[in-house]
Amino acid sequence: MTFCDENNLDLIKKDLRYLKLLANQYPNISSASTEIVNLEAILNLPKSTEHFLSDIHGEYESFTHVLKNASGVIKRKIDDVFGNSLRDNEKLTLATVIYYPEQKLELIKQSEKDLSDWYKITLYRLIELCRVVSSKYTRSKVRKALPHDFAYIIEELLHEHDGTINKHEYYNGIVSTIIDIDRAPEFITAISKVIQRLVVDRLHIIGDIYDRGPGAEIIMEELMKHHSVDIQWGNHDILWMGAAAGSEACICNVLRISLRYANLNTIEDGYGINLLPLATFAMDVYENDPCNSFIPKTINKELTQNELNLISKMHKAIAIIQFKLQGQIIKNHPEFKMDDQLLLDKINYEKGTIDLDGHIYKLNDTFFPTVDPKDPYKLTENEDDLIKKLTRSFVNSEKLQRHIRFMYSKGSMYLVYNSNLLYHGCVPLNEDGTFKEITIDGVRYSGKSLLDKFDSLAREAFFFKNGSSAKRFALDMMWYLWCGPNSPEFGKLRMTTLERYFIDDKGTHIEYRNPYYKYRSNEKVVTNILKEFGLDPDCSHVINGHIPVKTKAGENPIKANGKLLVIDGGFCRAYQPETGIAGYTLIYNSYGLLLSSHEPFSSIRKAIEEEKDILSSTIILEQVVSRKRVADTDIGKELKKQIAELKMLLIAYRKGLIKEQDSKS
């Protein structure tokens, strides 16, 4: 609003009640004017950097490193600041100090002959680098990012200018004193963490924090400490959310996947869930069963034969319970249209065969001691008792509940942010590329409205009162989101879990994808998706995860003429031989979009000791002619609204509609 509008008082009078509330914060012309100047200045700052990660799958070491190196942003900043004035090995050491300050400093102490000199050089370099990465923020924002113990000192050093002789001596004196009083390691650690924090302003996690990796709970702890993060739920996240909410079918799936990959760290050590009842049950029921189809898939894990035997039996036990519980859900919800996954009643238990759509297949395992052929989906008394105990463990795990509450508070099915549409799986489509229409509770949904409905149901599953019919339905929908034919998280027509365990013919294992995956390279279809979510397709993108990009086979992560980007992080080691790389991440800064492809990460130990960073290749997707400013972002839109409201308040003061007050001290 401009001041030429002063004579038009209708809008101001209409909003007078709100403006009086605003006047409590800005009680006079002076304070309102100062805030307008401040906000206008912020609008002209460069847009801050966003970092996009996806499909972490519990691989906490790789995730931690990519988070610390910001997909190569810190190395690029070091190159920008120091150019050819530092050798490559010096740049590597400086980068490693920033990533892992405490651990790297311990090694430096053991190898460096003149430690004071090394401290001095490193401090100057870190201060110079921090000055550059903080330059796109207001002093107020930088101040909030500073650690309490060193806040004043770091702020002084960041705003020293070489042209001021007196200040230069003051600056040198601070650095020397830090070293003299043996506080250099603590200061280096503090300023390194400030650089880590400032180099990326917003972190987007596009799904699948959980899965087969050994440290999902460690990743969640890191995310809870992060200054600004959002999460778009993945199918594996939905499964854990359903389990934490009390869905027995989701709990069985979570346990089955963990046992399939012999990953019990997260279950037992991370969340304190007691698996002894499951182990006891499995050893009793499957004592003499080799459970050959349930031997866990281990990657870089050494297990004893006894451990393998026990895990295999637990694996089979929970899988059979899962098939029974899923069958009950399907029977209770004919509207799910999943009768093709009712398979226990298709087994001929005498002949050891199964009938799939009129085709008879031989089973590779015919030992089903807990299945009643006349009522195959009914739990035995012991199975029912077991699943109740396991459910209590999940819903009473304090740490799991805390993590999942965070997942809800920071997460959603999708996010529109700075002209980008972020989601993990897909927007369900028909064969002709139009939005798939699905009926839930008698109401038809498609496109954006469908994802909004699933988002609402996911929250009802966790937050609604236990025992209510609405909660029960929402819990069943969490399982549907995991494997249902029209789930935007699953993105396939059916899940062939039982077939993969019990039928050797791999033709029965195929899982056909939703037509979305055929059309996500089609610019017209992606344009329609962007419009559906209220975005301008000429300057917007879909950021997508879920399906690994098979770079090895020549697949390109850039689709639909650059309108859709696939950034499955490739953290999951099992996919890396298939994809050929360790996935993609995305950076969106004031200059444009940068897509990074990564080689597999070895270990944090090697990163510290041998300075082995992840090798990354960066593609510049879009480069703007003039740098994007805060004014061009979602935050900028909000600031402009605030400025307009403050200008209205100024007019109200000048017209005498609101009386000025003294500024509050």
UniProtKB/Swiss-Prot annotation:
Cofactor(s) the protein needs: Mn(2+)
Entry keyword set: Carbohydrate metabolism, Hydrolase, Manganese
This enzyme's EC code(s): 3.1.3.11
Catalytic activity: beta-D-fructose 1,6-bisphosphate + H2O = beta-D-fructose 6-phosphate + phosphate
Domain of life of the native organism: Bacteria
Known pathway: Carbohydrate biosynthesis; gluconeogenesis
Keyword Amino-acid biosynthesis among UniProt keywords: no
Pfam families according to UniProt: FBPase_2 (PF06874)
Matching InterPro entries: FBPtase_class3 (IPR009164), Metallo-depent_PP-like (IPR029052)
One of the protein's GO biological processes: gluconeogenesis
Enzyme's top EC category: hydrolase
Molecular function (Gene Ontology), one example: fructose 1,6-bisphosphate 1-phosphatase activity
Protein family (similarity comment): Belongs to the FBPase class 3 family.
Name of the protein in question: Fructose-1,6-bisphosphatase class 3
Organism of derivation: Clostridium novyi (strain NT)
